């Protein structure tokens, strides 16, 4: 008799994806972040669901409903801070996951990679709309500034912004629709993640060497289930330390002031995970140019397979490309720091140089270095 795990229509899908899945024997801890992202997503949906039970999406009551959650709801403060800091963990895992893909050439799985880029955009949109919901000062002004960027689109820009706002400024209609979208998008993300996984399982996982591992596969369970559980425990530990000891470490103090359209905060800035893109946006004096650079900074990921000029898939045996990769990481950290600084003398020029370097490394230096490495192999 066949095991029910292998014969039942529903169990069979789970079995082929998480139990009997053939996995490369040499994938490192950098491959843990896909499962961590799945855990983050489920976690965010659950905490978000409980927050939505007590939240009201009205400009007059939104701020006080969040205060009510923190003060009056049983363990409401834990749920709220788990959700807020869970978003930070989500983005840390996302950035590492994308970085892993760049380093080991995982972008050569075209469908998986492109759906991954769409997922990144969707998660960023969801996080942005979630940041607006508490209706604090930074929520309101962040929403105003970021939605206003669309007015840079020629001809239809102004109409588009007013259509998104549902009026002539960020107001009740905007908050209500942002709550609706923030609630529905995580389920869209879940569906996209399933498709992402579907395409990945068509080809099988990449591995650190970038060489086919078909001749050396091991079952996903128990080897990688156990490894993923260890990774999840580490992530939970970091998240709980953050939530229980310094829940506001990554937040903005301005968001503890109720939204006031008549009073602009001295420094409008988004959450830390958007600062690198915000720095690129600010580094260009022209509004439309800045918006295009902002979109290009993420959309550039779609070009990665076309910019791959190396004969080797992975960077494991390419020291020159490795140097460039870590330069790119350092550059992104610099951009993140600059995005949180005021627009004044040393920061403006540092931001502009870091922005130029970001595009230069990806579009010019990496492909050229790969060609040089190809020629070095002939020696």
UniProtKB/Swiss-Prot annotation:
Coiled coil: none annotated. GO terms for biological process: mitochondrial electron transport, ubiquinol to cytochrome c. Keywords: Electron transport, Heme, Iron, Membrane, Metal-binding, Mitochondrion, Mitochondrion inner membrane, Respiratory chain, Transmembrane, Transmembrane helix, Transport, Ubiquinone. Binds 2 heme b groups non-covalently. InterPro entries: Cyt_b/b6_C, Cyt_b/b6_C_sf, Cyt_b/b6_N, Cytb/b6-like_sf, Cytochrome_b, Cytochrome_b_C_euk/bac, Cytochrome_b_N_euk/bac, Di-haem_cyt_TM. The chain crosses the membrane at residues 33-53, 77-98, 113-133, 178-198, 226-246, 288-308, 320-340, 347-367. GO terms for molecular function: metal ion binding; ubiquinol-cytochrome-c reductase activity. Its cofactor is heme b. Heme b b562 binds at residues 83, 182. Component of the ubiquinol-cytochrome c reductase complex (complex III or cytochrome b-c1 complex) that is part of the mitochondrial respiratory chain. The b-c1 complex mediates electron transfer from ubiquinol to cytochrome c. Contributes to the generation of a proton gradient across the mitochondrial membrane that is then used for ATP synthesis. Heme 1 (or BL or b562) is low-potential and absorbs at about 562 nm, and heme 2 (or BH or b566) is high-potential and absorbs at about 566 nm. Belongs to the cytochrome b family. PANTHER family: CYTOCHROME B. The cytochrome bc1 complex contains 11 subunits: 3 respiratory subunits (MT-CYB, CYC1 and UQCRFS1), 2 core proteins (UQCRC1 and UQCRC2) and 6 low-molecular weight proteins (UQCRH/QCR6, UQCRB/QCR7, UQCRQ/QCR8, UQCR10/QCR9, UQCR11/QCR10 and a cleavage product of UQCRFS1). This cytochrome bc1 complex then forms a dimer. This is Cytochrome b. It comes from Sus celebensis (Celebes wild boar). The lineage of its organism: Eukaryota, Metazoa, Chordata, Craniata, Vertebrata.
């Amino acid at each position: 008799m066949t095991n029910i795990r292998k014969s039942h229509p529903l169990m069979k899908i789970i079995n082929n994806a998480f139990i009997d899945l053939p996995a490369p024997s040499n994938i490192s801890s950098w491959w843990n972040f896909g499962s961590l992202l799945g855990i983050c997503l489920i976690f965010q949906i659950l905490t978000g669901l409980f927050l939505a039970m007590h939240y009201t999406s009205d400009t007059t009551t939104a701020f006080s409903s969040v205060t009510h959650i923190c003060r009056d709801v049983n363990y409401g403060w834990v749920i709220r801070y788990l959700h807020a800091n869970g978003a930070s963990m989500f983005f840390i895992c996302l950035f590492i996951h994308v970085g892993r893909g760049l380093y080991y050439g995982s972008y050569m799985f075209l469908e998986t990679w492109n759906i991954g880029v769409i997922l990144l955009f969707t998660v960023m949109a969801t996080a942005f709309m979630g940041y607006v919901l508490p209706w604090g000062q930074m929520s309101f002004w962040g929403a105003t500034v970021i939605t206003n960027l669309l007015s840079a689109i020629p001809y239809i820009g102004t109409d588009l912004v007013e259509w998104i706002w549902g009026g002539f400024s960020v107001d009740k209609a905007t908050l209500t629709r942002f709550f609706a979208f923030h609630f529905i998008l995580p389920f869209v993300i879940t569906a996209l993640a399933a498709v992402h996984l579907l395409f990945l399982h068509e080809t099988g996982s990449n591995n650190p060497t970038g060489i086919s591992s078909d001749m050396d596969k091991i079952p996903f369970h128990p080897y990688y289930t156990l490894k993923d559980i260890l990774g999840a425990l580490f992530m939970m530990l970091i998240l709980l330390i953050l939530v229980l000891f310094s829940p506001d470490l990554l937040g903005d103090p301005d968001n503890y002031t109720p939204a006031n359209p008549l009073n602009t905060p001295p420094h409008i800035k988004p959450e830390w995970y958007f600062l690198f893109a915000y720095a690129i946006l600010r580094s260009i004096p022209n509004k439309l140019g800045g918006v295009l650079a902002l979109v290009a900074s993420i959309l550039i990921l779609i070009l990665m397979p076309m910019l791959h000029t190396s004969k080797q898939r992975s960077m494991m045996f390419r020291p020159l490309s490795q140097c460039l990769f870590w330069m790119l990481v350092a550059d992104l950290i610099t951009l993140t720091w600059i995005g949180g600084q005021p627009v004044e003398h040393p920061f403006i020029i540092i931001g502009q140089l870091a922005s130029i370097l970001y595009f230069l490394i990806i579009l010019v230096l990496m492909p050229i270095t790969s060609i040089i490495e190809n020629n070095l192999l002939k020696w």
